[in-house]
Amino acid sequence: MQTGFVRKYTVLLLLTVLGYLFEVCVMPYLKIFGVTPNLLYVVIGIVTVAYGKLRAFWVGLTYGLLMQIMIPSVTFLNLALYSLTTLFCSFAFADKPLKTLEYERVVNRQRKELPAWLRTVLCTMLNTLIYEIVQITYIYLGGSAVTAAHILRGIADVVFTGLLCLLLQYPIRIAILGRRRTRPVLRPAPVVFSKN
């Protein structure tokens, strides 16, 4: 029990640090049509579905602080964007706690959840979309004309970040949660009481 706990949080710490280092050092050289996918939101999307809302918020807050310190464009913009978009998107895409799932099962209010891989990609793309909308709004409020090139670059960033998430989520989820083991499913059988 304790080994799994330590392993899971060690992987979370390494994922957070390596995600930031790769975003700053490697991703600027991996431009696709002049657009760099946002690796930080890929990591945030994966952490949101694999670890839950609270840990995703802490990773988003950490990334926001680091980006605010390293790239101080607008006062507290990166800090607010990374932490708040992570928090709001995690409500829609994070796994529900077991208590909530059991409560919904008892009161017959079950809803079908999307698969984890799809929720991860959608969470990443929604985070990136909100980030790009805020950036384009900031360009507009700064007095610059927003052109179709700005909008196309924003859309390209959302798509490329979603594709990067699709590529990276499986190896990272295996590192976090381990390989999925198939277990035999027990079939329900009627209970028979004997008179003895």
List where the protein language model places each region.
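Terminal, non-globular segments
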Residues: 1-196
